[in-house]
């Protein structure tokens, strides 16, 4: 029984380590750039739009909040991504800025 538990813990860790394992960060970057997401961020924070991801008062505390915020931004901009595309964008943002486990 202990061996089985150890086995399950070892093989479950990679899944737990990346909340967007099904996403492709390269595809996510293409989607992010193609939807001109950064232009809106520049309007919000000025200058470097990527500062929105690293600001000290971030409203994105975890992976779930990140995915929810991506969906919120979609509704604000009229972007219509599939769930898979949302995951790609989340994977890109997580890999580049957030680093959520």
Which functions belong to the PLM regions below?
Residues 1-23, 98-101:
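N-terminal export/targeting leaders of redox proteins
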Residues 13-33, 75-78:
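Electrostatic cytochrome c docking/interface patches
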Residues 28, 34-44, 89, 93:
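The canonical Cys-X-X-Cys-His
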Residues 33, 71-75, 94-98:
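Sec-exported extracytoplasmic/periplasmic mature domains
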Residues 52-60:
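Short cysteine/histidine-rich metal-coordination sites, predominantly Zn2+-binding motifs
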Residues 64-82:
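Short Fe-S-cluster ligation motifs
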Residues 79-101:
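C-terminal capping alpha-helices of c-type cytochrome domains
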């Amino acid at each position: 029984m202990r061996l089985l538990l150890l086995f399950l813990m070892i093989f479950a860790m990679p899944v737990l380590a990346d909340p967007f394992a099904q996403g492709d960060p390269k595809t996510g970057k293409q989607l992010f750039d193609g939807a001109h997401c950064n232009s809106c961020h520049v309007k919000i924070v000025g200058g470097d739009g990527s500062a929105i991801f690293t600001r000290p008062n971030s409203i994105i505390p975890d992976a779930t909040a990140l995915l929810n915020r991506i969906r919120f931004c979609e509704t604000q901009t009229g972007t219509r991504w599939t769930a898979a595309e949302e995951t790609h964008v989340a994977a890109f943002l997580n890999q580049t800025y957030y680093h959520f486990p």
